[in-house]
Regions:
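Positively charged n-region of N-terminal signal peptides that target proteins for export
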Residues: 1-4
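C-terminal motif of bacterial Sec signal peptides marking the signal peptidase cleavage site
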Residues: 13-15
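Tryptophan-anchored aromatic micro-motifs
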Residues: 23-39
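Short, exposed beta-strand-loop hairpins at the edges of beta-sheets
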Residues: 55, 103-116
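A short, structured loop/turn motif at beta-sheet edges
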Residues: 65-73, 94-101, 121-124
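An anionic, turn-rich surface loop/hairpin at beta-sheet edges
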Residues: 76-99
Length: 124
């Protein structure tokens, strides 16, 4: 009985927490993704429209096709892959959004291995 009462008291508090999902705000624009590799900060800048993403990393530019699965998930496929690894499609999933950023999860299509990151929108 006590467990039921505690659960009923906590339920309204849990329902107040809503994860923001304004994925449509991030379908197009210019973005920045910062991360660390062996303690060294790396930055990737990319621009995305509804069907193409152009990414620049360490002075090199790559272009990928985008296939939107739904408003928060899309698949990236490099247009000019340079090796077998780059031929593999990458599934991207926006998990939460804020006004100018989003947290996402990504991995090679068909693989259970996933990574997470945060992207900042720098312009429309």
């Amino acid at each position: 009985m006590k467990k039921t009462i505690v659960l009923l008291l906590l339920l309204p508090l849990l329902s107040c927490y809503n994860t923001e999902h304004n994925c449509k705000d991030f379908k197009t624009g210019k973005f920045k993704f910062e991360y660390k590799v062996e303690g060294v900060k790396k930055t990737t800048v990319f621009e995305r429209n509804d069907s193409i993403e152009i990414e620049t990393f360490e002075g090199k530019t790559d272009t990928s096709r985008i296939r939107w699965v739904n408003n928060c998930e899309y698949v990236l496929q490099k247009i000019h892959p340079k090796n077998m690894v780059e031929k593999k499609a990458i599934m991207m999933k926006i998990l939460t959004t804020t006004k100018n950023s989003y947290i996402f999860e990504f991995g090679i299509v068909g693989s259970d291995a996933k990574q997470r990151g945060t992207v900042e929108k720098v312009s429309e």
